[in-house]
Design a protein with these regions (language model features):
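ASCE RecA-like P-loop NTPase motor cores
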Residues: 1-278
Length: 278
């Protein structure tokens, strides 16, 4: 049963158990940010950021925002000792299917490393090759060195390999490109909230044709998607990639406590009205 909180400060007195799976729903994004500032002392707390886009906007969210969201979705899905904070509009907006935000690869020093397999996987998950890595969702390959800025990390990772084995894993500074601390393992997450592979593209194509009576070549979103490329604003068609409506409900599995800020229901109704207006 949900517990109602009056303000972002009330949560401090509720005694949240960090060893359980908790969801805190706020009335708006500003309240979510304020609440995060008030519970910084708790362990394993994540903010599911709002895309900052209006419903049906033909824009995509910023790479940093997208990376944080994917990391939060994945962490909340796989952990039973976590607290997630999100505004009601964020939870009512389209989100990825849980199957899409599970780690792609778990790499460790000394393990076998098939570079072509890894490259194929990250390309299908939306990573883009660049000469130098500076933003989440990018990778660079130079000889036996793979640089990648994962959506789940604060810093890009440098993977050095030799003879199909991982020799070193390090974070590095994207501005200076100088390696920093060593790490023992790394989990890959997708770059976008939708899959980019043959199955998902075929699903998208069929869903598009079933839903719209338009000439496909007139749509930049459709043509880019068919070429396995990211199209600005394609996220408004998120359900077409999965062949079904995607909501936050599957992520509620194993949640033990839900806290809801006062006036959240009113804000939910206002958001639904905004969707209908647009």
């Amino acid at each position: 049963m949900a517990k109602v909180i009056n303000s972002s400060t009330d949560i401090i007195n509720l005694g949240i158990d960090s060893s359980k799976k908790n969801l805190i729903i706020t009335k708006d994004s500003q309240s979510a940010m304020q609440l995060m500032n008030n519970i910084q002392n708790l362990s394993n707390v994540f903010l599911l950021e709002n895309s900052e886009l209006l419903p049906y906007d033909f824009f995509s969210m910023a790479p940093i925002t997208r990376a944080k969201r994917i990391s939060s979705f994945s962490s909340f899905l796989k952990s039973n000792e976590i607290t997630l904070v999100a505004s009601i509009s964020t939870l009512l907006s389209p989100c990825p299917d849980p199957s899409h935000v599970t780690p792609l690869n778990n790499l460790r020093i000394g393990e076998n490393f098939n570079i072509q397999e890894v490259i194929d996987n990250i390309i299908l998950s939306g990573y883009v090759r660049e000469d130098f890595v500076s933003l989440p969702g990018q990778y660079a390959l130079r000889g036996s060195v793979l640089d990648i800025f994962l959506t789940s990390g604060k810093s890009p990772i440098r993977i050095e390999f030799f003879d199909n084995k991982i020799e070193t894993l390090r974070t590095f500074n994207p501005e200076s490109q100088i390696a920093n601390e060593k790490i023992s393992s790394v989990n890959f997450l997708p770059s976008y909230e939708y899959p980019i592979n043959k199955i998902s593209i075929d699903t998208f194509k069929q869903g598009w044709r079933d839903s719209f009576d338009v000439f496909e070549e007139d749509s930049e979103i459709f043509t880019k998607t068919m070429k396995l490329r990211h199209a600005e604003g394609v996220e408004i068609y998120l359900p077409l990639f999965f062949g079904k409506r995607t909501t936050f409900l599957p992520f509620l599995r194993d949640v033990e406590k839900v806290f809801v800020q006062l006036d959240t229901e009113t804000k939910a109704q206002e958001f639904e009205e905004l969707i209908q207006e647009r």
